[in-house]
Regions:
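Helix-loop element at the rim of GNAT/NAT acetyltransferase active sites that forms part
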Residues: 15-29
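Conserved active-site alpha-helix within GNAT-family acetyltransferase domains
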Residues: 109, 113, 120-130
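Short loop/turn motifs at secondary-structure junctions and domain boundaries
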Residues: 41-46
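Conserved beta-strand in the GNAT
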Residues: 50-52, 59-69, 80, 85
Length: 130
């Protein structure tokens, strides 16, 4: 597996998978919103930055992002780890763990002082990362 910046060709399969699974949540309730968000992630070196896990055949396995001011209800939290998603056929292989580790390393490289993550149902999964 390789982790790299999200590429344009991954936006559509990622958007479809995210919409299928997360469409009940406001940011993911529209395919057009999802596509626009990931297109923004391709634009330069500023946050948001999205990363893709890719298998040796070049297939998208999952993604994660570094973001700024991700949630309006937490305006005091500037830097976020978000959108951690692994396509169903690649779950259980450690892809999510590697994406999170990659993002934490990238955040350190960028000099981000800390990251926040909001996930009401699986917070304990991420707590072991610190």
């Amino acid at each position: 597996m390789n982790i790299c910046r999200l590429k344009p060709e991954f936006i559509e399969p990622l958007a479809l998978a995210l919409f299928e699974e997360w469409h009940d949540f406001a940011p993911w309730s529209s395919l057009d919103k999802i596509r626009a968000y990931y297109a923004q992630c391709l634009d330069g070196d500023d946050l948001p930055l999205a990363f893709a896990a890719v298998d040796k055949e070049g297939r998208l396995m999952g993604s994660a992002a570094l973001k700024r001011f991700d949630m309006a209800c937490f305006p005091e939290h500037e830097y976020w780890l978000g959108d951690v998603f692994v396509l169903p056929q690649f779950r259980g292989l450690g892809v999510g763990r590697q994406l999170v580790s990659f993002c934490l390393d990238k955040a350190r490289e960028l000099g981000l002082p800390h990251l926040f993550l909001y996930t009401p149902d699986v917070q304990a999964v991420y707590e072991k990362f610190g």
